A protein has these predicted regions:
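Conserved beta-strand-loop-beta-strand element in the redox core of flavoprotein oxidoreductases
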Residues: 314-335, 341
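Conserved N-terminal glycine-rich FAD pyrophosphate-binding loop of Rossmann-like flavoproteins
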Residues: 40-83, 209-221
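N-terminal Rossmann-like FAD-binding beta1-loop-alpha1 element of flavoenzymes
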Residues: 10-37
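FAD-binding beta-loop-beta segment adjacent to the flavin cofactor pocket
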Residues: 257, 332, 370-377, 383-437
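Glycine-/small-residue-rich beta->alpha transition segments that form the dinucleotide
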Residues: 41, 331, 338-340, 344-351, ...
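A conserved FAD-binding loop/helix module that cradles the flavin
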Residues: 26, 49, 350-362, 416-417, ...
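Helical element adjacent to the flavin cofactor pocket in flavoenzyme catalytic cores
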Residues: 182-192, 228-250, 257-315
Length: 455
């Protein structure tokens, strides 16, 4: 190959650098395998809200706080698999009778593994499979989930009792309006848990170095707070804004650092002496997702996994085995040879599926399914239904896999002997409606990494 071309060799090659791909790569590497992870850039993980729904409530449903108190994960899993038999969880459940014990064991192993890596990379994540927590959002709503970054988890409103909450905005950062969110929170809790809140006050924090005009993005201030001197100034301003108040909790604008988020959170918690949290932020300003992606990057950098920045355009194939990936990087052509491959490219946001005219898997030409039936040449516009919140066939379409996570061909056989799939490239569920997207990433990524290391 030419001087500007790259030819790499590994035991396992993972395509995709989001939650599922990184989990698969880290797991395979932890089993002693030589792993290459190839990605072209950030995908859906970096733009997600940061909540890790496993058996959570749909973000599109209007569910009250009683949902948290009465969450039954065994029933939730059984109901999900009955309603969505092609859901990826069905591949991990080992049959109806063993569904919950097998799923619980798999979740415990996967979550312990990933959360340990994230914590070491500077992002603490908290929560449980058997509980839902409720968190304020910048839209003034509540978002229920299983796992969340510590900065969000500390603000679980389902656990408040006689709380005196200070909501602190930052001058110029219009994404978070503390007065609006505070009034909304008071109204919701007055209806559903009147004992939760005794007072809510809103304040504004002035940042001396920020421009006076509005339109400042949360990530701009977050990057500023990665600097130690500016962190100290910010902590002083926050403490000053709370003078004269007696508060038990503080919800701050979602600006508490990017690369040094843990240090910012620890400093403020220590300085204020009360739990400090942030609201969840939907896209496009979803800083929690960007922090998670940065933490995944640091986890990869601290592991034995080799990262290759390239766009995979195709593969060298011999019979029913993949020999190598072919792609384009900044320095020219890239070829990555491996014994086993993991496809974790996501759906439309990550580039795993393309949807111009018909829906296609973008690298291997794998068939795309809806409800266990291949879409073939079915036009995209025939996969859409009236109604904004209607279940859209297009949005739960994806590839299918067997119990070992090997993608299937149109006849239901493993398409390739040495290819596995993980994450949202797998169909059978709707990311917006079913409250399981990150759980699928975590569980299938972990499992695919184990299978890739073992075979």
């Amino acid at each position: 190959m030419g001087a500007s071309e790259m030819d790499a060799r590994a035991d396992v090659a993972v395509i995709g650098g989001g939650l599922s791909g990184v989990t698969a790569a880290l797991r395979a590497a932890s089993q002693g395998r030589d792993v290459v992870l190839v990605r072209r850039g950030y995908g859906a993980t970096a733009t997600g809200c940061g909540a890790l729904d496993v058996l959570g409530a749909s973000p599109c449903e209007s569910l009250g706080l009683m949902t948290c108190a009465h969450h039954d994960p065994v029933h939730a899993l059984g109901s999900l698999l009955k309603r969505l038999p092609a859901h990826p969880y069905a591949m991990l459940a080992e049959g109806p009778a063993e569904a919950w014990p097998a799923f619980r064991a798999r979740f415990d192993a996967a979550s312990d593994f990933l959360l340990d890596h994230l914590a070491k990379a500077g992002l603490a994540v908290s929560g449980r499979l058997d509980a839902l927590t409720a968190h304020a959002t910048t839209h003034g709503t509540l978002r229920l989930t299983n796992l969340a970054p510590l900065a969000v988890h500390r603000g679980d409103v389902a656990g408040l009792r006689e709380a005196r909450v200070a909501l602190l905005g930052v001058e110029g950062v219009s994404v978070f309006d503390p007065a609006f969110v505070g009034r909304s929170l008071e109204a919701i809790l007055a209806r559903e848990r009147p004992e939760a809140l005794s007072a809510a006050a809103h304040r504004a924090v002035r940042i001396p170095w920020a421009r006076a005009a509005g339109g400042i993005l949360p990530v701009e201030i977050a990057r500023d707070l990665d600097d130690a001197e500016r962190r100290e100034v910010f902590a002083e301003e926050v403490a000053r804004s709370l003078d004269g108040g007696s508060f038990t909790h503080a919800i701050l604008a979602p600006v508490l650092g990017l690369e040094r988020h843990a240090e910012v959170l620890e400093l403020l918690s220590r300085r204020l002496g009360i739990p400090v949290s942030e609201p969840l932020v939907p896209p496009p300003h979803a800083i929690h997702g960007l922090r998670m992606q940065k933490a995944l990057d640091r986890a990869i950098a601290g592991s034995r996994v080799r990262l290759v920045s390239a766009r995979v355009t195709g593969a060298e194939i011999a019979g029913r085995r993949i020999v190598a990936l072919e792609g384009e990087g900044d320095g020219g052509a890239v070829k990555i040879r491996a014994d086993r491959f993991v496809l974790a490219t996501g759906r439309f946001a990550g580039g795993g599926l393309t949807g111009r005219g018909t829906v296609r898997e973008s690298i291997f030409g794998l068939p795309v399914f809806h409800r266990a039936k291949p879409l073939g040449d079915r036009a995209v516009f025939n996969l859409l239904r009236p109604g904004y919140f209607a279940r859209q066939p297009l949005f739960d379409a994806g590839i299918r896999a067997d119990s070992e996570l090997r993608p299937l061909d149109a006849d239901g056989r493993a398409a390739y002997e040495n290819l596995l799939a993980a994450g949202t490239i797998l169909g059978g569920y709707d990311l917006a409606l079913d409250g399981t997207g990150p759980g699928v990433d975590l569980l299938t990524g972990f499992t695919a990494g184990e299978h890739a290391a073992a075979t």
